[in-house]
Amino acid sequence: MNAAKSLSIVPFLDCLSRLKTTPRTGWLYHGIEKPESIADHMYRMGILTMLCNDPSINKERCLKIAVVHDMAESIVGDITPHENVSKEEKHRMESEAMVSITQQLIPLNLSLQAEEIKELFLEYESASTPEAKFVKDIDKFEMIAQMFEYERKFNGEKDLSQFTWAGKLIQHPLVKGWLNDVLQEREQFWASVRQKKL
């Protein structure tokens, strides 16, 4: 990177831009054409964190974690279990990517902000705080909500029930309540699909 480039925000913006155009790989593996992007996923997660009504959780911090947690995927891509990459290797790759991304901010006198972004990522990865745990629940819930949207979009021609496993890991009562809403509506939807086939 030359000196002129190192003093520009553009390389950092380019990283963020890739999040807008990189599809969530899991949907591609299940035949969803033109699926949501990584940024689509993080945006809805961010909005959902703002609905947190638990006074013991800092929802502003949750929002920050939500919009940072998959940032490394702008470099490493959306790694799914299909790739057979170990959790340790995935964490190593993503941690290195976060260093690379945030280093672009240092020449712009944004060292503190770069450090905050890395800390938010590591907090999420380690699930070391109530906020990180809440965002992990939101991450799983958002995927299940998206699953149901795709099932409805394809009028019941695609059964994506293999994604529902994530719901069993959701802990926070608020997110569990939302999950129950989605799963109940999904049950009604599939009952209607089966009825039409009779």
Swiss-Prot record:
Binding of a divalent metal cation 2, residues: 73, 78-79
One MF annotation (Gene Ontology) recorded for this entry:
GMP 5'-nucleotidase activity
Which EC numbers does the record give? 3.1.3.89
* Ranges for domain HD: 38-144
Tell me where it resides: Cytoplasm; Nucleus
The record's catalysed reaction(s) read:
a 2'-deoxyribonucleoside 5'-phosphate + H2O = a 2'-deoxyribonucleoside + phosphate
Q: Which InterPro entries match?
A: HD/PDEase_dom, HD_domain, YfbR/HDDC2
Task of the protein = Catalyzes the dephosphorylation of the nucleoside 5'-monophosphates deoxyadenosine monophosphate (dAMP), deoxycytidine monophosphate (dCMP), deoxyguanosine monophosphate (dGMP) and deoxythymidine monophosphate (dTMP).
Q: What is this protein called?
A: 5'-deoxynucleotidase hdd1
Q: Which organism is it from?
A: Schizosaccharomyces pombe (strain 972 / ATCC 24843)
